[in-house]
Amino acid sequence: MADNHKVKLEQAQKYVDSIKDEVALSKYRQGYHFMAPASWINDPNGFIQYKGKYHLFYQYNPYDSKWASMHWGHAESEDLIKWNHLPIALAPSEFYDDDDDGGCFSGSAVDDNGVLILMYTGTTNNGEGTVQVQCIATSNDGVNFEKFEGNPVILPNFIEGNRDFRDPKVWKEGDLWYVVIGTTKNNEGRVLLYSSPDLREWEFVSVLAESHGELGSMWECPDFFRVGDKHVLMFSPIGLGTTITMYLIGDMDYSTGKFTWTEKGKVDSGCDFYAPQSLLDDKGRRIIIGWANSWPWMEWFSDFGPNMEDKWNGAMSLPREVKLDEKTGKLKFIPVEEIKNYRKEENKVELRILNGSKDIKISHRNRYEMLFNIDLKSTTAKELIIKLRENKNGVAIIKLDIENKQLIFDRNNCDGYNKGIKSCDLDLFEDTLSVNIFSDN
């Protein structure tokens, strides 16, 4: 088993190494968003701080810029922004994860007394359709992983006939390990909870949460964590229209396995943010990162874009810190502080636009951060429109609709590939000397 896995890893790594220099020359490569050295990536996996460094694993097809035969890519970072690529961590190699239309699906990572353990969904096909099971792999150095001889460690015994049973997210509470796994019943999304004393022998605990017709048909990539004195269940629902990442906030009783949620919300209001995963770092921060791309089943999708011809596809979002807004009871998401260390040249522009427009020239190939301070006290304008990347091929538009209290991003005429118009509400408070604006809480 170990020898076969090693051969598969070496083959995949050899191919990536043979094309990565060519891929690096692609004019579409990003400057400060994480990308694989080449080929296709999607969901973030195994997001963890281990022995002082941040580790990010990810769904990876090393052989093509299209989805297929999932491996786990791997990178590490000191600051969540600049990443160093490490050898591919997992490859399909065993009877439980060798499906050509599957492989080593999404999962998570935990530190078990210095041993880095990955838990992932293995997919195989027994001739009657795809079967999804949960498996583990271990490493003493955080780089080289061996699959557990007793895999799979969780079988789909509680999913009542369907074949969707994937994306384990593991954590420890007290003396027990817990894992949430996404599934569906009667075309309604749900998350199952299991517990274990050793990450190898698991018992079913409960249906942690489920849809009753209002929250989608399948819940992918669930994550369960504490923020403040509340617990959060985060997942990516299928079949919920333009809502592709959401959260439920409530209270957890581990003695009964019962999660009672009272609030729900979107993790992101844009088009390209899917399957986010969280970690808790040594500063006490809950940080998430998501896949910055879309699936063809999403209503705004039209094409993955020209980067596919350059032998790569996909990137991750900027990492965000998760906080609980005590006033609203909802979550707020803030770019991690580390991104400020990459600011180089500051260019302050004071604009007073009565009508028409004002051009702001940006250097560094569209790689910048732009902070706006808008004086709403003095303006009588009904809207403010910001045009990005305007050229002969199109334009992306950000519109602040002051009158209707909305922030709108429109990329329908941006590049000819992915489309979409997304908006979030603005909550504006004015009180003599103060103006406060909250965007989507």
Task: Go through each PLM region and give its residues.
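Beta-propeller blade signature
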Residues: 71-79, 133-142, 192-198, 245-255, ...
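Residue-level detector of beta-strand structural context in well-folded domains
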Residues: 32, 45, 73, 107, ...
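Hydrophobic core segments of beta-strands in well-ordered, beta-rich domains
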Residues: 43-63, 67, 87, 105-129, ...
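Active-site-proximal structural scaffolding
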Residues: 40, 67-70, 102, 129, ...
